[in-house]
C-alpha cells in the first residue's frame, strides 16, 4: 500500500473538491455492510450490518406477512409495497444488500434492473435458511434484474454473501476460514468475483477494515451492535487521508468535505441484525435500527416475533407516510449540511456532531441511546 501524507490543509481540500466534481451519481446510492460470525461477537451470536446510502433519505419500518413467514423490513417512505431494503423474518432469516458495479455482463436495459428490493421482499416471505435462499435464486426467472451483493444469516449458523447478477450467483461463505479467516467479512459496492478494479466503495471498505482489524485482531475485542454503530456507521476515519476526525481536534474544528467516509449526506439508515446461535429460540432475533442519518440517530431494538407491535415513532403515522424518528433526525441534519447552493452540499459542519467541548449533537444523543 502507498499512502500520501498531506500536511497542507488547502492542498487536501483542493484535491477533494476536484474529486467530488467528478463523482458519478451512483456513489450516492451505495452502502457499506459486514457479517460478523459468533467467533468475534460478545455473545457468540452472528451480526449482519447494513449501512444504507440512497437517494431516498426517508425510511421507515414495516411489518409484512409473506406466503410462509412474517417479517420486519426497512422500506422507503413513501412506499408502494413489495420492496424491502433489508429485513428479518420470524424464522430467523435476515437479509441485506449492497449495490455492485462490477458484476453485470450483459446488455439488459436499465429499465429492467434495480430489482434488489423486490428480490429481498420475496425472499423474506419464503426463506428459512441459506439453502432456501439458494433454491430461491435458482428458481427466479432470468434476467433477475439485479447486480448486487446479498448478505444473509439464518438461525442454523449460516452466514454468507451472495454476489448476484442477472443470470448467476456466487456464494462467499463467511464460516469458511479460506473466505473469512478472522470470522468477519466486509462488503461495499464491488464484488470480489467481479471485474478487477471496477465498482465503488474501496475507500469505505478500507475504512471499515482498518477499524475492525484494530479492534478485533490487535486488541482482541469482541463485537456487539453498539460497537458496530459507533465504529462503523458513526466513524469518521478516512483510510486514504489517514485522518480520523473524531480524534484529530485541529482537522475537526469546523467544516470538512463529505467524501468517502462511511456516514455521508446520502446515508439514510443503519441496521444491525442480531441473529441466534443454532438451537436457540429464533424469537430472540433482534433488528437494531437507526433511521435517518446514523451519526444523529438513535439505535432502536425491534424483535421480529413482536413485529406487529413496532414502536410508533419507527412506522408511518396517521398524519404522515414518514416515521417520526426519521423526520426528527433529518430536521437536525439540516444544521449539519446547511449549504444548498453550488457544491455546498458536499461540505458538512463536523463540529456540530462532535467537538472537544462534548456538546456535539452525536455526543448528546449517545446518552439517550
Annotate each predicted stretch with a short phrase:
Residues 13, 22, 60-68, 123-135:
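Short, basic/low-complexity N-terminal boundary segments at the transition from targeting/disordered tails
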Residues 32-81, 86-87, 94-122, 154-369:
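C-terminal, well-structured catalytic/ligand-binding subdomain of enzymes
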Residues 1-30:
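Bacterial Sec-dependent N-terminal signal peptides
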Residues 86-88, 142-143:
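Short, charge-rich binding segments
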Residues 116-148:
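Intrinsically disordered, low-complexity linker/loop segments enriched in Gly/Pro
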Residues 151:
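An amphipathic, aromatic/His-enriched active-site/gating alpha helix that lines ligand/cofactor pockets
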Amino acid at each position: 500500500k502507498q499512502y500520501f501524507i498531506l500536511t497542507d490543509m488547502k492542498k487536501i481540500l483542493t484535491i477533494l473538491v476536484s474529486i467530488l466534481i467528478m463523482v458519478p451519481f451512483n456513489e450516492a446510492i451505495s452502502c457499506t455492510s459486514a457479517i460478523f460470525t459468533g467467533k468475534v461477537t460478545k455473545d457468540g451470536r452472528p451480526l449482519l450490518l447494513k449501512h444504507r446510502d440512497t437517494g431516498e433519505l426517508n425510511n421507515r419500518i414495516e411489518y409484512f406477512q409473506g406466503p410462509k413467514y412474517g417479517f420486519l423490513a426497512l422500506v422507503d417512505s413513501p412506499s408502494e409495497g413489495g420492496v424491502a431494503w433489508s429485513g428479518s423474518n420470524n424464522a430467523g432469516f435476515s437479509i441485506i444488500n449492497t449495490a455492485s458495479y462490477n458484476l453485470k455482463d450483459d446488455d439488459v436495459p436499465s429499465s429492467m434492473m434495480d430489482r434488489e428490493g423486490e428480490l429481498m421482499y420475496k425472499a423474506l416471505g419464503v426463506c428459512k435458511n441459506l439453502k432456501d435462499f439458494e433454491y430461491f435464486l435458482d428458481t427466479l426467472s432470468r434476467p433477475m434484474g439485479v447486480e448486487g451483493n446479498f448478505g444473509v444469516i439464518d438461525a442454523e449458523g449460516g452466514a454468507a454473501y451472495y454476489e448476484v447478477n442477472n443470470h448467476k450467483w456466487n456464494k462467499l461463505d463467511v464460516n469458511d476460514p479460506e473466505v473469512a479467516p478472522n470470522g468477519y467479512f466486509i462488503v461495499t459496492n464491488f464484488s470480489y468475483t467481479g471485474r478487477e478494479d471496477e465498482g465503488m466503495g474501496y475507500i469505505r471498505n478500507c475504512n471499515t477494515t482498518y477499524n475492525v482489524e484494530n479492534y478485533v485482531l490487535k486488541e482482541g475485542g469482541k463485537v456487539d451492535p453498539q460497537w458496530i454503530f459507533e465504529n462503523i456507521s458513526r466513524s469518521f476515519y478516512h483510510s486514504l487521508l489517514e485522518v480520523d476526525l473524531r480524534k484529530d481536534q485541529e482537522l475537526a474544528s469546523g467544516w470538512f468535505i463529505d467524501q468517502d467516509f462511511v456516514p455521508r449526506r446520502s446515508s439514510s439508515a443503519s441496521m444491525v441484525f442480531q441473529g441466534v446461535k443454532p438451537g436457540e429460540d429464533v424469537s430472540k432475533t433482534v433488528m437494531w435500527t437507526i433511521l435517518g442519518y446514523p451519526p444523529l440517530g438513535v439505535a432502536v431494538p425491534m424483535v421480529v416475533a413482536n413485529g406487529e407491535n413496532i414502536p410508533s415513532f419507527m412506522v408511518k403515522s396517521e398524519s404522515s407516510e414518514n416515521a417520526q424518528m426519521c423526520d426528527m433526525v433529518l430536521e437536525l441534519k439540516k444544521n449539519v449540511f446547511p449549504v444548498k447552493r453550488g457544491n455546498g452540499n458536499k461540505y458538512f459542519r463536523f463540529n456540530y456532531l462532535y467537538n472537544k467541548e462534548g456538546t456535539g449533537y452525536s455526543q448528546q444523543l449517545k446518552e439517550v441511546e
